[in-house]
Amino acid sequence: MSEVGASAGTSEVLVSFRGVQKSYDGENLIVKDLNLDIRKGEFLTLLGPSGSGKTTSLMMLAGFETPTAGEILLAGRSINNVPPHKRDIGMVFQNYALFPHMTVAENLAFPLSVRGLNRTDISERVKRVLSMVQLDAFAQRYPAQLSGGQQQRVALARALVFEPQLVLMDEPLGALDKQLREHMQMEIKHLHQRLG
């Protein structure tokens, strides 16, 4: 990936990649000199061929990979050395990464309990986010008892339940059929409009 300009707008910059590079072997750069500003409330899609560094860039932003060079800022603060669970970033993976041994409600409660919220707050947030993704009736089901679209909505709800300042999605619709993919694109668009 190469230099990308920031979109026009007056809102504040939420994410900034400054000269970010990533190499796994010390020789070949997967991400080369990425400079990108993402503004608060902006919906941004990274496009490129396989192997161009899209997922690697998301993983560095989320904290699952470390840049070889450069700096990543979140709300004006360097996060290069901040662990993933302290970045206030929700992430939806392509394979959804739901815990198969936990119910939907337990999957949603997990990021809240890790953050030390009390049971009452956890219960309220889980109910609210289940309603948001229209899965109220599925709270006690396990991921294997859900359709692909329902699993995708649970993964999205889990990324939103702790009210992060940023949500990242790595090909979240890739495993869905065309009709469901188009439906979920609209769902994500509506959620973005509501939540910013």
Predicted segment positions?
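ABC family nucleotide-binding domain
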Residues: 3-180, 184, 190-191
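Conserved H-loop
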Residues: 196
